[in-house]
């Protein structure tokens, strides 16, 4: 059977049909969380700390890290997200020993996350958009990481399952 292995420095999570259910904690994400976004812009990572510890205590096998916040002081995520991703990953790795899932729509933040993460993280939210694939697939090969793929391309998410399958095969 096919299986996917995700690792931290000390722990391994195996995803596959003949393995137990794997829980991915998704709370470390400022998208739609105005209070967390404001805290991160102010340099306050206390909610990230609490969310990381609470999710592991609740049984998370993997923690998703998303630094997707647009700062009021600098609205360019290409500049703000990579260093924020690095800080968040370093913080979470210092608090927990579970593997990580790197989640971003900013290519530079993905690369920073992959460089910073210890072990073999999971790469989340990989779409079939041509421009994105051109950047992401070399990173996947360079860091030998598994991905969570989303079956949408430059035209969006199709309602036709055959089109979705074609996008997934990319």
Predicted regions and their residues:
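Domain-level signal for soluble alpha/beta catalytic cores
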Residues: 1-170
């Amino acid at each position: 059977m096919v299986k996917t292995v995700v690792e931290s420095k000390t722990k391994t999570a195996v995803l596959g049909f003949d393995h137990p259910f794997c829980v991915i904690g998704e709370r470390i994400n400022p998208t739609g969380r105005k209070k967390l976004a404001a805290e991160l812009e102010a340099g306050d990572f206390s909610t990230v700390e609490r969310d990381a510890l609470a999710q592991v205590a609740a049984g998370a096998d993997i923690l998703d890290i998303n630094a997707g916040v647009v700062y009021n002081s600098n609205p360019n995520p290409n500049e703000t997200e990579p260093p924020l991703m690095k800080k968040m990953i370093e913080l979470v790795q210092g608090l927990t020993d579970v593997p990580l899932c790197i989640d971003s729509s900013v290519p530079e933040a993905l690369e920073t996350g992959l460089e910073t993460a210890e072990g073999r993280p999971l790469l989340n939210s990989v779409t079939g958009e041509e421009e994105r694939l051109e950047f992401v697939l070399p990173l996947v090969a360079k860091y030998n990481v598994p991905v969570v793929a989303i079956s949408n391309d430059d035209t969006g998410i199709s309602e036709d399952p055959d089109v979705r399958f074609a996008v997934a095969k990319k």
